Amino acid sequence: MGVREQILEDIKTAMKSGDHFRRDSLRMLNAALKQVEVDERISLSDERVFSILQSEIKRRNDSAAQYRAGGRDDLVQKEQGEIEIIASYLPAQLSDAELAAAASSLIAQLGASGAKDMGRVMKAAKEALGSSVDGKRLSEAVKAALK
């Protein structure tokens, strides 16, 4: 069963159990996926779904930061709850040590030597690691390894 199908099944389960927050969060997530399908006129692969899920998490992290700055702790908790639900559909993320090791090995393979090679290393890292790492964490690890 693909990620998209799992989300649809979990919506049904949440409806049956009366978990309104989970149901509504998953419906918003499904709507975001459907919007991309309609806009791009494609059927989403699991890799594409993972990238959309990461975008949704990033969007909610940004919202939570703004709510925190505005003193709206109730909305911060809501966003954090949605982040947890969305993150449960992503593959396991690499640990910091694994990420640093992967970045170092890619830099060695590519013969990268400094910040000017950052783009080349990031491209190769994205292809190699896929959705198992957040882009921001990957960028930080590559920067640290290039220094």
PLM regions with names:
Residues 2-89, 93-115, 123, 127-130, ...:
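N-terminal cationic and glycine-rich segments that engage phosphates or anionic surfaces
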Residues 120:
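Function-critical acidic carboxylates
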Residues 136:
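Active-site alpha-helix of zinc metalloproteases
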